[in-house]
């Protein structure tokens, strides 16, 4: 409690924002088996004593988790072995349900395999540094949630009780699904983030760009027909934008409103006032699109941020389910039997 009090004073003093801060869970020594550092090493719980990596450790034997957060929780369980018999028996019963129900176990394995690291994505959302691809990973993960919930409710096992605690994330899923492009990039200020139809203003700006491109094509055809320069063509590069290129053999047909910008060995490059007008229309639309898409993305991310507690709860439940699943796999593969526990200090092996 003294440490928590100091932490609270630090937060208040420096005005630290704790958007993703979870509730304080008190660690009671009476709840967990205390294992000293030397014993942890000698037992090779997480690393072997030969190469000092996970291979050959207890963790390597029991780890069949499908998600990063499930793996982290399984690690925590090794650090904090339970002492309370009722809690141990609850885990045992859940593991047993999966061992005895192969259909449930197999379907759960597939669904867990489609879930990304919700816990880490949630943290990035909280600190405002998640990108659009993170949201797509989140959306794809959330698509498995109602399936897991339905699977548990139909299972007639202890997992049906867990299903009732799985939060509703349909709103978050629908928000991302309706707004963020599926093949989105990582960078937020290069556009290509938001779907057509999500925002009316953005659609208008995009349409202006399309109109500009159509005008550009028509203008090229018109100038070719008017000047009689059969090989007149529009060229684009990032430094100078759009320009007309005319080969040396047609220089006598170049009209007065063509302003020379660059001389090449076999051709010259020109600008016109009309070309500049159309170019500004296209480039202006492109910059407006990027700015608007970024603005919309930040708004979407902030909306999801308001539901961060829901995502935290979901992450905790998925990690718990995944850890139980992992134990059920190792129990099934190795044909483990379920031990009966007592508080009398008796070990009876038959």
Functional labels for PLM-detected ranges:
Residues 253, 316-350:
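Conserved NTPase motor "head" modules and their coupling/switch loops across ABC/AAA+ ATPases, GTPases
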Residues 264-302:
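Extended, charged coiled-coil "arm/hinge" scaffolds of SMC/Rad50-like chromosome-maintenance ATPases
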